[in-house]
Amino acid sequence: MELSPTYQTERFTKFSDTLKEFKIEQNNEQNPIDPFNIIREFRSAAGQLALDLANSGDESNVISSKDWELEARFWHLVELLLVFRNADLDLDEMELHPYNSRGLFEKKLMQDNKQLYQIWIVMVWLKENTYVMERPKNVPTSKWLNSITSGGLKSCDLDFPLRENTNVLDVKDKEEDHIFFKYIYELILAGAIDEALEEAKLSDNISICMILCGIQEYLNPVIDTQIANEFNTQQGIKKHSLWRRTVYSLSQQAGLDPYERAIYSYLSGAIPNQEVLQYSDWESDLHIHLNQILQTEIENYLLENNQVGTDELILPLPSHALTVQEVLNRVASRHPSESEHPIRVLMASVILDSLPSVIHSSVEMLLDVVKGTEASNDIIDKPYLLRIVTHLAICLDIINPGSVEEVDKSKLITTYISLLKLQGLYENIPIYATFLNESDCLEACSFILSSLEDPQVRKKQIETINFLRLPASNILRRTTQRVFDETEQEYSPSNEISISFDVNNIDMHLIYGVEWLIEGKLYVDAVHSIIALSRRFLLNGRVKALEQFMERNNIGEICKNYELEKIADNISKDENEDQFLEEITQYEHLIKGIREYEEWQKSVSLLSSESNIPTLIEKLQGFSKDTFELIKTFLVDLTSSNFADSADYEILYEIRALYTPFLLMELHKKLVEAAKLLKIPKFISEALAFTSLVANENDKIYLLFQSSGKLKEYLDLVARTATLSN
């Protein structure tokens, strides 16, 4: 189904909107919901698109239009058969008597034989979906007029040509007859018997009129009291089996028009001649063969119940009916191309009541591609097929919970969600997650959410998830966890860590992942994730990425809401929780120090003869003072002996060991640099004075240098600086 992007979007949206309406009604617990309305809406959507494409005037849309029309027919078939199969058929047992009319016996058979009734339903469906050409303009208004005028026919008796071989029918009469009978045949296949009768009357074809009047079995409300309230007068004809054989004998008359013979074959429950059958399609061929099954089984039942007199059995007719499976196989062999169409394969499975197995086969096809067993197949190459099968699985599970394997339904829905993601139809995705179990729902939703960055799209996702009553909190938690898991390998360095001042896409992906918790107002979880994010960034030298996160989010507000949420949820006060807030505060101080460091670097790079030296010196002194204070306090309390047994102690100590030496050495370098640029020697002395801080046994900062492997580098730096002071 090749469609423009507009059409594709509309159809995806139409199907998802239908499911959304169902869920809304279900969640609101309104009046009893008819799940079959979903199928009816699907049929309507497919039918409307078929009509739109057909009316578009674009020849390239012809195939797409036919495919959508075929899909509309499919949903119609699903509706008809599933309604019947799931109906409460606890009907009163009909008691029959030998004197009842044969029509009542037929009614009893259809009531008891569910398989036969379903064949009748399929035939009704085929009739309703049979295309009948427009009424031909040259349908004759009288019989044999040209032959009588030319003298080739000596009698106006309509059956005279059959009884007298010497008559010569005019060629034009034969042509008009062919047009008429072909039209009548199409009307009969479409179930338009009344219309066919009217056409026969208008064309003066009394024989066809009389024959069509014998279609119905005899019913008499006088003796058939069981259905007396359904009829006022008798209907149908007696000795219907005799009528059937008489009509059948006419179908064997080689001298008749092929379509006239085909009419008689169909009415008698036989297969039409090859001259007509060669022009049949999958649907009409199926119709003809199902008609044969129906008529054969009905007469067999009547024979078993002694409702057919021996005087009616003037000709032998087939008494063995094919099975529906055999019929479908035969039709498939005659129409291989049509029968291989994926939608017709689904139609056949609906008729055979084997939809769950077909759904499972579709899943196997998906897995074959994933495993690499197949490069492609219909379910992958034809997205419309995935859409149909997915929605079919959803409908079946709604109507008959458990009728579709949970794993099959899940794989179809999650694959379809991936298709929607490729189409950029994010708003349509959450509704499908509602039909998954909670575990699969979390995985499917988190898979999608973890890839979203646009603020408006993210906001809409949360709104929709909440509106559909999905487990929003767990979905957002799983999304954040998924992003942490996905990026873990990127933050497992094998070489020496260096402080970097760039922000890459992976950093942003992790930031977006944590922000789901903030946007979802899950502040307790958000604080825990901010801790995890900060540690991951800092342990890998991604200090600028942490700065980016803190610039994007109001950390103070998050911490306040964190405290309020704990109170509201009656979460007991925990020493570790207080430690988390303190840890975040420490990271804020670090980021502030990094900003000052970068600002000083910028000031130095812009230094010129026009620079305000006093202001610059003041700025350096402020930077030096703040950095010195940060060096002395950064994570000191959280890595004190009081927390030595804490599970987080080693992590925090490692972060401190990475950044404290970095800050101290960079401050040292900047003071030395400033001393040279500004010609102020005392800055060198200030830099060298840091050695006492490093060697101080109270602060034990030298241990941080040892731990980070920076001690030798620092001592070399001090030695070089010392030569400058001499």
Curated annotation (Swiss-Prot):
Domain of life: Eukaryota
Entry's localization field: Nucleus, Nuclear pore complex; Nucleus membrane
Record has Transport as a keyword: yes
One Pfam entry name: Nup84_Nup100
Membrane topology: Peripheral membrane protein
GO CC terms of this entry: chromosome, telomeric region; nuclear envelope; nuclear membrane; nuclear pore; nuclear pore outer ring
Main location, first listed in the record: nucleus
GO biological process assignments: double-strand break repair; mRNA export from nucleus; mRNA export from nucleus in response to heat stress; nuclear pore localization; nucleocytoplasmic transport; positive regulation of DNA-templated transcription; positive regulation of transcription by RNA polymerase II; post-transcriptional tethering of RNA polymerase II gene DNA at nuclear periphery
Family classification: Belongs to the Nup84/Nup107 nucleoporin family.
Subunit note: Component of the nuclear pore complex (NPC). NPC constitutes the exclusive means of nucleocytoplasmic transport. NPCs allow the passive diffusion of ions and small molecules and the active, nuclear transport receptor-mediated bidirectional transport of macromolecules such as proteins, RNAs, ribonucleoparticles (RNPs), and ribosomal subunits across the nuclear envelope. Due to its 8-fold rotational symmetry, all subunits are present with 8 copies or multiples thereof.
Function, as annotated: Functions as a component of the nuclear pore complex (NPC). NPC components, collectively referred to as nucleoporins (NUPs), can play the role of both NPC structural components and of docking or interaction partners for transiently associated nuclear transport factors. NUP84 is involved in nuclear poly(A)+ RNA export, in NPC assembly and distribution, as well as in nuclear envelope organization.
UniProt protein name: Nucleoporin NUP84
Origin species: Saccharomyces cerevisiae (strain ATCC 204508 / S288c)
Gene name linked to the record: NUP84
